[in-house]
Amino acid sequence: MSLKNSLVIYGGSFNPPHNGHIIIAQLVREMFRFADFHVVTSSTPPHKKVDVSFKERFFLTKKAFEKVEGITVSDIEHRLGGVSYAINTIEYYEKKYSHIFFLVGEDALYSIEKWYRYEDILKKAHMLVYPRFKDELVYKKVERVLESLSNSIYILKLPLIQISSTVVRERAIKGLSLYGFVPQHIISYVEEIYGNR
């Protein structure tokens, strides 16, 4: 298969974006140098409640990735409107790109059968899965999915990055240092947005 005219989509609520997101994006960008790379901020995620506005999260995500070469931060899910289903984003981009790669954490893979139109997602895009946990047994939970959809799902060999948006939010609320957790140039913004909650 020719991989010309390809796109990697890295979607998420980015609530807030952190250094783990940036490291993962950089590592995958290096693996897929031939492809465009779009970081897509979810407007209205279907599976989680987000108490920070899209406008604030998108602003932080743009700021967080502004110094990362070769990456575009997109507001397409906000422009499309409604609930931010992955399939809608993929179908928007497939009009322009021949090959779509959708980057997710391994925890998202466990519930993929519950995703809206998940079979269409796996027909239209290749899933790139990055590790979130050390426990080898977790893969047994998705064995049946991997066996039936092995042509669509690729487990990436990347280092485990132990930073989460939940931890960053909790630290901001408690007034603890965010140094090393988020890019230095957005620390004050994250503190302002999340520290007052």
UniProtKB/Swiss-Prot annotation:
Q: Which family does it belong to?
A: Belongs to the NadD family.
Question: What Enzyme Commission number does this protein have?
Answer: 2.7.7.18
UniProt-listed InterPro entries: Cyt_trans-like, NadD/NMNAT, Rossmann-like_a/b/a_fold
Gene Ontology MF terms: ATP binding; nicotinate-nucleotide adenylyltransferase activity
Query: Which SUPFAM superfamilies does the annotation name?
Result: Nucleotidylyl transferase
Example GO biological process: NAD biosynthetic process
Q: Which UniProt keywords apply?
A: ATP-binding, NAD, Nucleotide-binding, Nucleotidyltransferase, Pyridine nucleotide biosynthesis, Transferase
Q: What does this protein do?
A: Catalyzes the reversible adenylation of nicotinate mononucleotide (NaMN) to nicotinic acid adenine dinucleotide (NaAD).
Q: Do the record's keywords include 4Fe-4S? A: no
Name of protein: Probable nicotinate-nucleotide adenylyltransferase
The metabolic or biological pathway listed in the UniProt record of this protein is: Cofactor biosynthesis; NAD(+) biosynthesis; deamido-NAD(+) from nicotinate D-ribonucleotide: step 1/1
What's the source species for this entry? Thermosipho melanesiensis (strain DSM 12029 / CIP 104789 / BI429)
For whether the record's keyword set contains Protein biosynthesis, the answer is no
- Reactions listed under catalytic activity: nicotinate beta-D-ribonucleotide + ATP + H(+) = deamido-NAD(+) + diphosphate
Q: Source organism lineage?
A: Bacteria, Thermotogati, Thermotogota, Thermotogae, Thermotogales
Q: What is the enzyme's main class? A: transferase
